[in-house]
């Protein structure tokens, strides 16, 4: 007996997409965002179903992973929100230290007078 060959080979649909990291630059209505990719290309991104169902907030300035089709590189699907770096927290703590130092200087000047 001869076996029928599958004329249409099944391909993994994920192979037709490329994943990039990008920065959300603008929030648009209906879960759409403008995202600047690492190669300075700006594309339109929409939230994937899992992110939408788990109520993950995506705001301007967030770093995201976005899946872009090889056939239409102007649109992509946001599949993951990357965790924030602690740079802002470090800046906040430096600012508070500066305030403490300036208050200490005022206290020493007042005690001298």
UniProtKB/Swiss-Prot annotation:
GO molecular function: ribosome binding; rRNA binding; translation initiation factor activity
Source superkingdom: Eukaryota
Outcome when changing residue 33 to L: In strain: cv. CL2l
Keyword list, A-Z: Chloroplast, Initiation factor, Plastid, Protein biosynthesis, RNA-binding, rRNA-binding
Annotated InterPro entries: NA-bd_OB-fold, RNA-binding_domain_S1_IF1, S1_domain, TIF_IF1
Record's subcellular location: Plastid, Chloroplast
Chain intervals for the UniProt region annotation (Disordered): 86-113
The protein's assembly and partners: Component of the 30S ribosomal translation pre-initiation complex which assembles on the 30S ribosome in the order IF-2 and IF-3, IF-1 and N-formylmethionyl-tRNA(fMet); mRNA recruitment can occur at any time during PIC assembly.
Function as written in the Swiss-Prot or TrEMBL entry: One of the essential components for the initiation of protein synthesis. Stabilizes the binding of IF-2 and IF-3 on the 30S subunit to which N-formylmethionyl-tRNA(fMet) subsequently binds. Helps modulate mRNA selection, yielding the 30S pre-initiation complex (PIC). Upon addition of the 50S ribosomal subunit IF-1, IF-2 and IF-3 are released leaving the mature 70S translation initiation complex.
Family the entry assigns: Belongs to the IF-1 family.
The protein's name: Translation initiation factor IF-1, chloroplastic
Organism: Hordeum vulgare (Barley)
Lineage: Eukaryota, Viridiplantae, Streptophyta, Embryophyta, Tracheophyta
